[in-house]
Every structure is written in structure tokens, then in C-alpha cells.
Amino acid sequence: MKFTIHAGHNPDGKKACGAVGLIKESTENRKVKDEVMRLLKLKGHTVYDCTVDNGTSVSDIVEKQVEKMNSYSGIDLHISIHFNSGANDKEGNKKNTGTEVLVYNTSGTKYNTAKRICKKIEELGYKNRGVKTRTNLGVLKNSKGQALLVECCFVDDKDDVTLYNYKTMAKAIAEGILNEVIVENTTTSNNTYVVTCNSLNVRNGRGTEHKVVGSLKKGDKIVVWSFANDTKGQSWGSFRYSFNPDVIGYVSKAYLKEVK
């Protein structure tokens, strides 16, 4: 497949740069964009970078992005990477504000892709704010073909930022786009872990405050999709706990050992 991708806004420190909170949008969205590109290319797809770093205004940036996007033919999906703001929760309230994906309308393949991306980011521990239609955004309105805009998480919410890691965020986005689990072939890891304690609770979210939905026994092996921290900084792994595709389990990394 063919994709275009870009990180929104000018770089940090320039006019019309992204939101600034506990982290900076224009720094993080470029890191996420680069990693999504790497993963899509790893799976054999063609990806064009349409990021603009020299815009003179918000509208000029969007115009230049759209011009780049529409210069390529045969594109299956245009991807715009952003971070949200407006939560105003820099101290943290143990509840993250979450993720959402924006589309111009619900027609075509982009809508289901957007839902998958939301679900994948939700698996990292973020609140799923869902897919929303926005008809006033230039990159969605004026691009040719299917397009979506990912609002990864909120830069001004401590709980969002505590969970955030650009690599796990990018992996979730790439997996949502491709509708597959991406496992990189390395000599050191196959993503398989064995349980080291007698009984390990499986929860429906990252953190001990979440409901216990089952348990694993010592010696059980699982394939972990990704690790991310809870609001206390403890690492939790997500995995497919049952044959029900809607059931995602979370276990503490402290009681797992990698199988090499």
C-alpha cells in the first residue's frame, strides 16, 4: 500500500508551532511520525513524508501539506499526526484525557481504520474518545482520497504524559492502519514472556485500580503486544487474553520474564 504521513505544525520555536504543555507537540509528533514511517516501511509499504517545517502561518502550513499530499498518486491513506491540548491537568488526577481520531466524514475505509487506531491506543491505557468528524480541517477537507488525523494524547495532562512513549504510540497507530500485530524479527526478543509468580492477576486496564478479569499461573506463556506505564510509573504489558477479539488483558511486567 501507499501512504503519506506528516507531523502537524511548524517545529517548536517557530511561528505556528504545535501545542506546548508538559511535552511539546511539534517535538513529539515528529518522533511518532518517524516511527510510524519506519514500521510501515518495515512491512513493505511505501510512505511519503509530507511534513512542513517552513510555514509562515497555520494556513500556509496546511496549504503546503495538502500540496505535498496531493502530489502523489495512488495513495491508500493520508495520515496526519497531532497531539491534543485543553485538559489543563498538569498535576494529574489519575484519569487520562485520552486519544481521538478525526475524519472528514464516515465514508470509505478511513472510518474503520480510524476506529482501529483508537482501539489500539486505548490498549496502551488511554481513554478512547472515539472517531470524530471535522469538516473544517484543511488536511482532511482538501486532500484527495482517504485521510485521517490522529490526536495521540493531551500534552497538558500529567496522566496522559505519564503513559506516553513515542514508540508504543507509533506502534499502536501503525497496527491500527495495517490491521495487524507488528512483531519485529530480532535476535534478542520474540515478545514471548513467562509468568514467574504463582498467580498473576489479569486486569482490564493498566494499574491495580482496574478490575481483575482472570489470572495466569506460574509457567504460563503469553505474547505481549506492548509495554507502557500506569499513572504510578509501573510497567504493564497488554496481550490477547481470550479468543474474544474485544478482550484485552493487562499484567504487571514485574512478574514476567522474557523467553529468549
Task: List each language-model region with its residue ranges.
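Short glycine-rich His-centered loop
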Residues: 1-22
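Active-site-proximal helix/loop segments of hydrolytic enzymes
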Residues: 3, 14, 26-185
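Solvent-exposed coil/turn segments that connect beta secondary-structure elements
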Residues: 8-10, 84, 106, 155, ...
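Extracytoplasmic/periplasmic beta-strand context in beta-sandwich domains
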Residues: 129, 135, 198, 235-237, ...
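SH3-family beta-barrel domains
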Residues: 185-201, 214-218, 233, 257-260
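Predominantly extracellular/luminal cell-surface or secreted proteins
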Residues: 203-205, 240
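Short alpha-helix capping/helix-loop boundary micro-motifs
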Residues: 206-211
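SH3/SH3-like beta-barrel superfamily modules
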Residues: 215-255
